[in-house]
Structure formats: C-alpha cells, structure tokens
C-alpha cells in the first residue's frame, strides 16, 4: 500500500484541480498508442491508428482518454485506498480485457510527461515525485487482480 504524506496529497490535489481532463486524457492515451504501438491491439475498434497524427486526432482515442483520466480522478479522491478504488477496474482489465499490467505503468509514465508539458515550471521535482508515486500506486492497484 502506498502512503502519501499530507504535503504530497496537497501537491497532487492542487495540480489535479487545474488539469483539463479532456485534453490531457486524449493526449495521454494517444501518446501511449504512438510511443508503445503494441498497446494498439487493445483498441482495434477505434478505427484509424495508422500514424501518430491519425491517433492523436482520433475522436475515439480522445473520448477514451477522457474516460481514463476521469477514472484517474478516483485515485486523487482515494489516495488512502487505491486498491479499493480500482478493484472493479482491475478485475475488468484482468479477467475480460486481458491487458498486460505493464501497460498501466507505461500509461502512468506518459501521464506524468503530459502533466509536465502542460504545467511547465509549475511541475517541479517535488510535484513530479508526488505524481510519480500516485501513478505507480494506481498501476499497482490496477494490477492487483492478476494471478
């Protein structure tokens, strides 16, 4: 279980309140699909994923990215119980979707990159450390149901 200090929680919550969920979510999922093309196999119904520009402009990628980042908001609200907050999503991704849990780590790292690009100098090393801890905790929580 990940333990967050009061300062880390404040840092995460402060930045989260400024995140444009739709924009950052689409960018994060799009970047994941471009940088790690093998992840595209989980999104075969999304249509054209043939190039970086096709992926980044794909409305289904943007919509699902928003959904992913919206659910990530549950992590921000439940930092003290990430495992519980993501139990159902862990089960879905393990039992039904068969997503390799390593992909959760990749998406988390991409998310940190997106936040850094969006917030620039405001994304200090302390902010990055807190967010890296959160995305790592979420990846672990999502991987919980895997055997």
Curated annotation (Swiss-Prot):
The modification Phosphoserine is found at residues 14, 51. It comes from the Eukaryota. Red blood cells. Keywords: Heme, Iron, Metal-binding, Oxygen transport, Phosphoprotein, Transport. The keyword Amino-acid biosynthesis does not apply. One of its GO terms (cellular component) is blood microparticle. PROSITE patterns: GLOBIN. One of its GO terms (molecular function) is peroxidase activity. InterPro entries: Globin (IPR000971), Globin-like_sf (IPR009050), Globin/Proto (IPR012292), Hemoglobin_b (IPR002337), Hemoglobin_oxygen_transport (IPR050056). Heterotetramer of two alpha chains and two epsilon chains in early embryonic hemoglobin Gower-2; two zeta chains and two epsilon chains in early embryonic hemoglobin Gower-1. The epsilon chain is a beta-type chain of early mammalian embryonic hemoglobin. This is Hemoglobin subunit epsilon. It comes from Otolemur crassicaudatus. The lineage of its organism: Eukaryota, Metazoa, Chordata, Craniata, Vertebrata.
